[in-house]
């Protein structure tokens, strides 16, 4: 019995050690399996070495919608502008009516007399221009009504006059600048010199030399020592020396680099 107990005691630690070793080995295998990169899995393909982006071409349906949108875009914008203009006009008119109603509901004390003065002045202008031309029929009532309004509302009339004068001045300055720019442009174009035709000018030092010579001496002519030395020095500095006889005179001509020519008499 004692031997059996000792055997059990010796076998239990060995079993525990084996179990712990197997568990540790299993954990290491699991950790190794978890450290695998996603690119190394068989479900992924190797990326190409050289890739190029290709833009997707629009189809027929997309091109059709684009052409319709571009064709109707300007008309839609014009309709939107008209709608906004009409809407703002209606809103301003409604607001003006509301303000006028509130003002007329509780008018100040001097409102009715002032309106009476303006109305009477306008009617007086209409009556005075009854037998006149159309211009008088328009200007007389407006002028007298404006005069009556100026008398009744001097402060507002001064403000309106200042604003109108500023607008007129700005418009006149713009017109003056446009006319001035056109005038300066036209004056600059007129002041520019016209291109002249190229003319061939001959210098006064150029002298025409006849191509034909009467007679060229083939035999040598004895020259004095001074002239021979000059001829030698000139022949050294030039490329051509030609001696000709014209009318009993011996003429020596040098090349183009020599300015003087020698004349000898026999």
Swiss-Prot record:
Quaternary structure annotation from Swiss-Prot or TrEMBL: Component of the mitochondrial contact site and cristae organizing system (MICOS) complex, composed of at least MICOS10/MIC10, CHCHD3/MIC19, CHCHD6/MIC25, APOOL/MIC27, IMMT/MIC60, APOO/MIC23/MIC26 and MICOS13/MIC13. This complex was also known under the names MINOS or MitOS complex. The MICOS complex associates with mitochondrial outer membrane proteins SAMM50, MTX1 and MTX2 (together described as components of the mitochondrial outer membrane sorting assembly machinery (SAM) complex) and DNAJC11, mitochondrial inner membrane protein TMEM11 and with HSPA9.
Parts of the chain that traverse the membrane: 111-129, 138-155
GO cellular component term of the entry, any: MICOS complex
One Pfam family, short name: ApoO
Keyword set includes Isomerase: no
Domain of life: Eukaryota
Descriptive protein name: MICOS complex subunit MIC27
Biological processes per GO annotation: cristae formation
List of residues that carry Phosphoserine: 204
Keyword Chloroplast belongs to the record: no
Residues exposed to the Mitochondrial matrix side: 130-137
Keywords: Membrane, Mitochondrion, Mitochondrion inner membrane, Phosphoprotein, Transit peptide, Transmembrane, Transmembrane helix
Mitochondrial intermembrane topology ranges: 28-110, 156-266
Annotated gene: APOOL
Subcellular location(s) per record: Mitochondrion inner membrane; Mitochondrion
Function of the protein: Component of the MICOS complex, a large protein complex of the mitochondrial inner membrane that plays crucial roles in the maintenance of crista junctions, inner membrane architecture, and formation of contact sites to the outer membrane. Specifically binds to cardiolipin (in vitro) but not to the precursor lipid phosphatidylglycerol. Plays a crucial role in crista junction formation and mitochondrial function.
Family per similarity comment: Belongs to the apolipoprotein O/MICOS complex subunit Mic27 family.
InterPro entries in the record: MIC26/MIC27, MIC26/MIC27_animal
Record organism: Pongo abelii (Sumatran orangutan)
Bilayer topology annotation: Multi-pass membrane protein
């Amino acid at each position: 019995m004692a031997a059996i107990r000792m055997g059990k005691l010796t076998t239990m630690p060995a079993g525990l050690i084996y179990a712990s070793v197997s568990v540790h080995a299993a954990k290491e295998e699991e950790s190794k399996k978890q450290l695998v990169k996603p690119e190394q899995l068989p479900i992924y393909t190797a990326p190409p070495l050289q890739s190029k982006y290709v833009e997707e071409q629009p189809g027929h349906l997309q091109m059709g919608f684009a052409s319709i949108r571009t064709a109707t875009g300007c008309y839609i914008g014009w309709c939107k502008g008209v709608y906004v203009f009409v809407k703002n006009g209606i809103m301003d008119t409604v607001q003006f009516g509301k303000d006028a109603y509130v003002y007329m509901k509780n008018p100040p004390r001097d409102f009715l007399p002032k309106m009476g003065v303006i109305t009477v002045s306008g009617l007086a202008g209409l009556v005075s221009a009854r037998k006149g031309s159309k211009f008088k029929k328009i200007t007389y009532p407006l002028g007298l009504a404006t005069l009556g309004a100026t008398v009744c509302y001097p402060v507002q009339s001064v403000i309106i006059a200042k604003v109108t004068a500023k607008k007129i001045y700005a418009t006149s300055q713009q017109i003056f600048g446009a006319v001035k720019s056109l005038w300066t442009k036209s004056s600059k174009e007129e002041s520019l010199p016209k291109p002249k035709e190229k003319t061939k000018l001959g210098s006064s030092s150029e002298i025409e030399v006849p191509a034909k010579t009467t007679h060229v001496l083939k035999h040598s002519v004895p020259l004095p020592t001074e002239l021979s030395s000059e001829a030698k020095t000139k022949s050294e500095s030039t490329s051509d020396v030609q001696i000709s006889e014209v009318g009993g005179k011996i003429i020596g001509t040098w090349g183009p680099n020599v300015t003087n020519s020698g004349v000898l008499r026999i």
